[in-house]
Amino acid sequence: MAKTIAYDEEARRGLERGLNSLADAVKVTLGPKGRNVVLEKKWGAPTITNDGVSIAKEIELEDPYEKIGAELVKEVAKKTDDVAGDGTTTATVLAQALVKEGLRNVAAGANPLGLKRGIEKAVDKVTETLLKDAKEVETKEQIAATAAISAGDQSIGDLIAEAMDKVGNEGVITVEESNTFGLQLELTEGMRFDKGYISGYFVTDAERQEAVLEEPYILLVSSKVSTVKDLLPLLEKVIQAGKSLLIIAEDVEGEALSTLVVNKIRGTFKSVAVKAPGFGDRRKAMLQDMAILTGAQVISEEVGLTLENTDLSLLGKARKVVMTKDETTIVEGAGDTDAIAGRVAQIRTEIENSDSDYDREKLQERLAKLAGGVAVIKAGAATEVELKERKHRIEDAVRNAKAAVEEGIVAGGGVTLLQAAPALDKLKLTGDEATGANIVKVALEAPLKQIAFNSGMEPGVVAEKVRNLSVGHGLNAATGEYEDLLKAGVADPVKVTRSALQNAASIAGLFLTTEAVVADKPEKTAAPASDPTGGMGGMDF
């Protein structure tokens, strides 16, 4: 495909037009009085959202240079969302302000590389100030306030705070769609995975269609179990001990399954067979997690253990195991606490080293099952469009709350960034680097000004007033009052604010140092074929 090339000012201005098109659509959503954006979908109902990254993802521009500019800003929003779960609109507004000021200085003759270095040094200084001023999140109320700001709904904030209180900071909070109105919170104690009993004959509670085993032995096998002769010696030992048995294996089939079912029906021996969750290496890892949680060993020929030689010392234990046809919950496994802590640390290291979002999510789920618990927030709404929008807001708010616990909180509403600007005066920079730091100083006002504008107030007047207030005091845009924002519950996780600024500065540096853009040449659409009816189509003969 042929390419089209633009150089220096033309290239940078093309990129800036794309950035502005995207940023102007996103920034209307900033703040408590921000508006929504409607996104058309090829299939199904349109989506209504105020989430920056969702809006950014949908924007595709026609002009090749503008398209590249928009794609670069999408990267800012996506990266901020990946790291912190929120702050995508703030990041976009900051990027737009940095690029606008930066390009003005480049056009006036400043050296782009000098500006870039100045911007980087200034951002490092502001980040240092933010982390220093951050307040630790200690109470349930602080978590609720932070989550409520992200979701724009106090009831959602309260529910997330309760969920985090129950499952702990390491626990997983998932959001599901509900067929009813309102919000519900479901808590799962112990480890739950999405595989249930293999046969309905294992059910012990016919009304609830559940199989419940009290204080069972737990056998974990990495392969299929099909022949009964391998299993018999172990079954005899379990029967002698007067216990029930849970078998979790790749599969239980044939005569082995028949024997278990027949003994269950006759009342001779209580057991349940369940397929192991996951596939391949992930299945092995999850079996190992269960082994550590219950104090078992995984029976696998890879480590020289066979089913016929298995004795009770290789089995795990738990206070209770509950199975439905779709899922299994192991409550209070009898594993060694030090071994569990070691496994948790190992999974945490894997999360840090993982490049894949999918792998990271799966590892996070495994971590929660071992370290904390699982809370499910069920969200309902009147229409499908509203339901999707609400579910998305709750997911963002959950990640926002976790970010707050991780690094602490600072005053929200764009105030902290503006009030961090004086720290840049301590930087002893000269020439273009000093200009770069000044660009950051101007850009730090942009989020507050945009929040004020969206609230129907005069941005310049608000910024000047907040600049002269004591640290942490500023405009509460929801009420129009100037007050102590942390006391009023207007807080942002420092991780969100920091990530937004760092990612915006990163992309602004790329914009300023761009000297040429190579893009695909738009293909000319083929001229329509001539009308075979000679222009007289539609005549009725």
From Swiss-Prot:
CDD domains to which the protein is assigned, alphabetical: GroEL
Gene Ontology molecular-function annotations: ATP binding; ATP-dependent protein folding chaperone; isomerase activity; unfolded protein binding
Oligomeric and partner information: Forms a cylinder of 14 subunits composed of two heptameric rings stacked back-to-back. Interacts with the co-chaperonin GroES.
Alphabetical keyword list: ATP-binding, Cell wall, Chaperone, Isomerase, Nucleotide-binding, Secreted
Encoding gene per record: groEL2
Note: Purified 65 kDa antigen can elicit a strong delayed-type hypersensitivity reaction in experimental animals infected with Mycobacterium tuberculosis.
Keyword Isomerase belongs to the record: yes
Entry-linked NCBIfam families: GroEL, PRK00013.1, PRK12849.1, PRK12850.1, PRK12851.1
Sequence similarity: Belongs to the chaperonin (HSP60) family.
Protein name: Chaperonin GroEL 2
Gene3D superfamilies (UniProt xref): GroEL, GroEL-like equatorial domain, TCP-1-like chaperonin intermediate domain
Major localization listed first in the record, in broad terms: secreted
